[in-house]
Amino acid sequence: MEEPSGAQLLGPVEIRALAEKLDVTPTKKLGQNFVHDPNTVRRIVAAAELTPDDHVVEVGPGLGSLTLALVESAASVTAVEIDPRLAAELPETFQWRAPALAHKLSIVLKDALKVQQSDMAVQPTALVANLPYNVSVPVLLHMMEEFPTINKVLVMVQAEVADRLAADPGSKIYGVPSVKASFYGPVTRAGSIGKNVFWPAPKIESGLVKIVREDTAWKQDDETRKKVWPIIDAAFLQRRKTLRAALSGHYGSGQAAEEALRAADIDPTLRGEKLDVTDYVRLAGVLQQKDEK
């Protein structure tokens, strides 16, 4: 039966049939778990809050479960797929399940960590994806870095990764991913996804993470990241250490680290987990001012 909006979403029977046709066995190496529940797919698209003007990039479309639903809500969808078999089959699936919407689909056959602006016919305004679990955080951060046009994100990741990304300063699970993701705007949990909507069913549950890119007091460019990222990395490398000790290598000595921290109005005896992204950006700014003198 055709979906009211013009696409027939994939259920368990269609997913298994496609996998058998392509001789595809989901692999841990590529972090593959295929969603076979249409209601879950609809829920993800609804949580993304897309508009008809949005150009979506989807990383790891797999057999096309989410892709079919995305084209209904957006102006276009660019699917980034590393597996040649899956990439080649996706247009066929659209001719079968959503022929009237096939013109909205573009495919980039590439590792998502190597995708560049030049790969895209249209620069994306939204990232919506069931991210490959083994590289979810690096892919998320790369896409935010490479495509400043992305202003909204809704991704599905492992539940514990979702918790880390959305963690607040001071939390035991607050860390490098939390700070770097919040560099672009507020990061929130947008729901949980059970194991049984996937094939094969993973051992752990999944979570939805939402990011809304905001205009920040700092530039979200490579130059700023190159100053801020190393400080974040150093602060959490030995998270039990005080910032004075943790950043001594970065600044050349404990004394230099303490001076920079005090100049940024940060207590040197605090640990890295107590600072938010604004603190880290401010600290990087102190170093920049020092370099400019």
Curated annotation (Swiss-Prot):
Q: What is its EC number?
A: 2.1.1.182
| An MF annotation (GO) of this entry | RNA binding
- Pfam families xref list: RrnaAD
The record's section on SMART domains has: rADc (SM00650)
Catalytic class of the enzyme = transferase
Binding positions for S-adenosyl-L-methionine? N33, V35, G60, E81, D111, N130
Answer yes or no on keyword rRNA processing. Answer: yes
Listed A to Z, the keywords are:
Cytoplasm, Methyltransferase, RNA-binding, rRNA processing, S-adenosyl-L-methionine, Transferase
What PROSITE patterns does its record include? RRNA_A_DIMETH (PS01131), SAM_RNA_A_N6_MT (PS51689)
**InterPro entries reported in the protein's UniProt record:** KsgA/Erm, rRNA_Ade_diMease-like_C, rRNA_Ade_Mease_Trfase_CS, rRNA_Ade_methylase_Trfase_N, rRNA_adenine_dimethylase, SAM-dependent_MTases_sf
Q: Where does it reside?
A: Cytoplasm
Reaction catalysed by this chain? adenosine(1518)/adenosine(1519) in 16S rRNA + 4 S-adenosyl-L-methionine = N(6)-dimethyladenosine(1518)/N(6)-dimethyladenosine(1519) in 16S rRNA + 4 S-adenosyl-L-homocysteine + 4 H(+)
What are its GO cellular component terms?
cytosol
Instruction: Give the UniProt family note.
Output: Belongs to the class I-like SAM-binding methyltransferase superfamily. rRNA adenine N(6)-methyltransferase family. RsmA subfamily.
Q: Write out the function statement from the record.
A: Specifically dimethylates two adjacent adenosines (A1518 and A1519) in the loop of a conserved hairpin near the 3'-end of 16S rRNA in the 30S particle. May play a critical role in biogenesis of 30S subunits.
Q: What is the protein name for this chain? A: Ribosomal RNA small subunit methyltransferase A
